[in-house]
Amino acid sequence: VSGIENLPKHGPVLLLGNHISYIDFALIQWGTPRTIRFVVHDDYYRKPVFNWILRAVGAVSIRPENSRNAMQSIVSLLNDDCVVGIFPEGHVSTTGELSDLKRGFEKILSESKDSVVVVPFAVNDMWGSFFSKAPKSIKKKKKFSFRRDVNITIGKSLTSDTNRSEVKKSIGNLLF
């Protein structure tokens, strides 16, 4: 993990980053000292293999067609000085590139206290792994292994009045 000094030791933090694999949340949590409450699509809670893991780490379930309760939970967590992680693309990448960001985090920030620090991050070197949505043709070119070098880069913080284009640019600058 590079840029760990950019993650505040205390206070509310909204971590926003790219979503390149199904295990991004675990990689980031293992590499950072603070507990991160990730926002996860409700479909994953319905899968037995993920359900117990997501409950154990205190992930927040979100259903896009009924996101109001999840939004209120996220705002409450931030107001309680927690770290909340969101993948604002809203899906695991199917191309390896950063997609357009959804608006949800802007709404969360508008309803949270002003002291929320927005911290961009990027997960690098997971595209083409077993855990990515890369096509089989790309996965075949990479030797299968559960061990691989992964780089997580944590960027400099942004203010709570940031917007999608600033966040996307910040995340994009951390990708390589």
Which residue stretches match the model-derived regions?
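Hydrophobic/aromatic ligand-binding patch that stacks against planar heteroaromatic rings
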Residues: 28, 53, 76, 107-111
